[in-house]
Design a protein with these regions (language model features):
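C-terminal flanking tails of non-heme Fe-dependent oxygenases
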Residues: 1-148
């Protein structure tokens, strides 16, 4: 892949990086065990860094369509490829499809916390002939209804 600039330069001085703290409350016991806490999706940004969650639940999908539980070992950092890295690499690096499933019954009374750091390129970074980081983000936020 021919990136417009090195990845480390793309995120340098970015004003759109975002750290989220997500709280998944404990279950009451009447939830459907097959329901999802977060449906399968890919992140819009370049790369997501994620400290292992406090409880199991995060799963990633492999290229054959199989789901795999992600570790919650302390000190582990998960690296997810986002749609912007897929775009800038011309599809060479596919976005990580992931979801959060309900916990098993023996741990369902515990809250789950997650802290993803979404790394975004600077607005003017050229992702492809069609997009800068800014135009790509705006288009995607419109698609999912987070921007009008």
């Amino acid at each position: 892949s021919n990136f417009s600039e090195p990845l480390k330069n793309m995120i340098k001085d970015s004003r759109t990086n975002l750290l989220r703290v997500i709280h998944y409350p404990p279950f009451l016991g009447d939830e459907d065990s097959k329901s999802l806490r977060a449906a399968a999706h890919e992140d819009i940004n370049l790369i997501t860094l994620l400290v292992a969650g406090t409880r199991p639940g995060l799963e990633a999908k492999d290229k054959n369509g199989n789901w795999h539980q992600i570790t919650t070992d302390p000190g582990t950092i998960i690296v997810n490829i986002g749609d912007m890295l897929k775009e800038v690499s011309g599809g060479y690096y596919p976005s990580t499809t992931h979801r959060v499933v309900n916990p098993s019954s023996e741990i369902n009374n515990d809250s789950r916390y997650s802290m993803p750091l979404f790394l975004h390129p600077r607005d003017e970074v050229k992702l492809s002939k069609n997009y800068t980081a800014n135009t790509y983000l705006k288009e995607r936020l419109l698609e999912i209804g987070l921007k009008s």
